[in-house]
Amino acid sequence: MTKITLSLQNFRIQKQETTPLKEKSTEKTSLAKAILAVKNHFNKLSSNLSERFISHKNTESSATHSHRGSASADRAVLTNKVVKEFMLQTLNDMDIRGNASKDPAYASQTREAILSAVYSKNKDQCCKLLISKGINIAPFLKEIGEAAQNAGLPGATKNDVFTPSGAGANPFITPLVSSANCKYPHMFINQHQQASFKIYAEKIIMTEVAPLFNECVMPTPQQFHLILENIANKYIQNTP
């Protein structure tokens, strides 16, 4: 039987360093204070950031609202400009002067149509006013009929009153306004805008056709308008 002998030298008990209880308590307190300080600092920082964010959002919202209002106004102005440019391009595509230079009959018909439109516009405006005042319009119609006949417009005489055969609206206005209305319908909902675009169409048409009257005996649209306006004023001024 083998005898086992244990030597005490092989087993050494190492001394374990221990921290006093009071020192551990102090460390815990310091750590808690540090954590609390960090927490308070974080809360304060979060609050400041939140206030800044809200302030920035309010400023941004106000600026955005102001920008949108300005953009809306700019967009309206821009759209009016675009519509007018489209109408001008449409008129250029019609090439009234180019066609008139190639076709004398077309040039003659264009002049007659323009002057007849001037006649109709002045007649309607003055007759409406005279009728509203209970004035007989027959003498006025007779006199402006004679003016139209003297201007070289073809027509017919009925009940001693000459009426141009082409009397009516300017034939070039409708194509311009209609084409713009089809392309930009949202711009023609307002009656004021409709009237504005119609006036613009008449203006650019008169500018376009003016050279057609340079070498003919017929008065220009502006001259014919003044002739009819003077006749109308004579009757209007005599109204009570």
Curated annotation (Swiss-Prot):
One of its GO terms (biological process) is actin cytoskeleton organization. It comes from the Bacteria. One of its GO terms (molecular function) is guanyl-nucleotide exchange factor activity. Residues 78-240 are annotated as: GEF catalytic domain. GO terms for cellular component: extracellular region. InterPro entries: SopE, SopE-like_GEF_dom_sf, SopE_GEF_dom, SopE_N_dom. Transmembrane segments: none annotated. Keywords: GTPase activation, Guanine-nucleotide releasing factor, Secreted, Virulence. Gene3D superfamilies: SopE-like, GEF domain. It is found in: Secreted. NCBIfam families: PRK15279.1, PRK15280.1. Belongs to the GEF (guanine exchange factor) SopE family. Encoded within a prophage region, which is only present in very few Salmonella isolates. Activator for both CDC42 and RAC1 by directly engaging these Rho GTPases and acting as potent guanine nucleotide exchange factor (GEF). This activation results in actin cytoskeleton rearrangements and stimulates membrane ruffling, promoting bacterial entry into non-phagocytic cells. This is Guanine nucleotide exchange factor SopE. It comes from Salmonella enterica VII.
